[in-house]
Amino acid sequence: MKVRASVRKICSKCQLIWRGKRLSVVCVNPRHKQKQG
C-alpha cells in the first residue's frame, strides 16, 4: 500500500474507489494499491 498525495491508475486494471473521504486505487496487482493521504 502506497500513501501518496496524488493517486493515479498505473495499469488498465486499476480502479479508483472513494472510501469515505479517501480516494484509493484497487488493482489485481497488489503493488498498485494506493491511498491518498
UniProtKB/Swiss-Prot annotation:
Keywords: Chloroplast, Plastid, Ribonucleoprotein, Ribosomal protein. InterPro entries: Ribosomal_bL36, Ribosomal_bL36_sp. GO terms for molecular function: structural constituent of ribosome. Coiled coil: none annotated. It is found in: Plastid, Chloroplast. GO terms for biological process: translation. GO terms for cellular component: chloroplast; ribonucleoprotein complex; ribosome. It comes from the Eukaryota. The keyword RNA-binding does not apply. Pfam families: Ribosomal_L36. Its main location: plastid. PANTHER family: 50S RIBOSOMAL PROTEIN L36, CHLOROPLASTIC (PTHR42888), LARGE RIBOSOMAL SUBUNIT PROTEIN BL36C (PTHR42888:SF1). HAMAP family: Ribosomal_bL36. Belongs to the bacterial ribosomal protein bL36 family. This is Large ribosomal subunit protein bL36c.
